[in-house]
Amino acid sequence: METEYSKRVYQGVRVKHTVKDLLAEKRLRQTNTPRFSTSSSSSQPAFVPMPGSHVLPGYYSMRRSFLQDSELCHTVKQYSSDTYSSALGSKAFSYDHASTYPAFIDSYYTPDSYGDYRGPTSYTTSGGSLFPPSSLPTLLPTLSGESSSHLLLRDPWDQPSEDSVNQTEVLCPEAAAPVADSPSLAGPDSGSSSPYRLTSGRSGSSIPSSSQPYTLQPLEDVPYTAPSYTSASSYSCPPYMSTPGDLAVVKMTAVTSEEASGGVVSLSDTTSWAKDDGTGSWLSYETRRAF
């Protein structure tokens, strides 16, 4: 008994039945009972190595036979080639032509409609019942003679020559009139009530008096005059926004007796900056700062 168990050592453990024994018993059961009960002839067993088959090493060094294609596909059961063809051939694929779709669709598949599609009559050869032949030409514009060439060759931004001439006559006096006719260059003391009003009495200008109800002023001009602005401040520098006439003639304003007695120092009086006798306002500021 010890000799039998000594042979059955599986990974250091004595076992009664090893995996090899179980596989051998299973293989014997498969060979004894037929695999396919319907097969009439006894073929070679599936796991028995045949002399012509290639033997591969299997699980736990057990030899297994490489099954060939002839062994897997048993020749006992033959599939006849006419099994499916006879079944399909008994009933042909046919359909009822009249009941599938209406008969008026056939008019679209006539050979006449597949002619030259660029021709003028290709749209009206076979319209069918859905689109009568008279409805298609009405959708297209009628181009004939000079009207067609005028519509095709003329750009959308083109304008007649007389319109462009009128526009230049209208736009040019608006830009040139404030420079030539504005009396602001003569000085602020010209005496005119509204020196910035655009005068439209130029020769060659076609602007009516009613087309410009408002007064046009240049961007750099201001509505008030220069003397009223400079009298409010004691600075002799010209304002930032002034008329060209004000820039040409700059008047130096003198310091009045009231401003001199009040201690207001004007920027135009350059002699006041040179005098520093220690009795000015700067000394009093320094003494106040010490506290």
Swiss-Prot record:
It comes from Danio rerio. Keywords: Activator, Transcription, Transcription regulation. Residues 7-29 form the OCA domain. GO terms for molecular function: POU domain binding; sequence-specific DNA binding; transcription coactivator activity. In the N-terminus possesses a conserved OCA domain for bivalent binding to class II POU domain-containing transcription factors and to an octamer DNA motif (5'-ATGAAAT-3'). PROSITE patterns: OCA. Coiled coil: none annotated. Residues 200-211 have a biased composition (Low complexity). It comes from the Eukaryota. GO terms for cellular component: nucleus. Signal peptide: none annotated. Transcriptional coactivator that may regulate cell type-specific differentiation pathways. This is POU class 2 homeobox associating-factor 2. Belongs to the POU2AF family. Residues 176-219 are annotated as: Disordered. InterPro entries: OCA, POU2AF2.
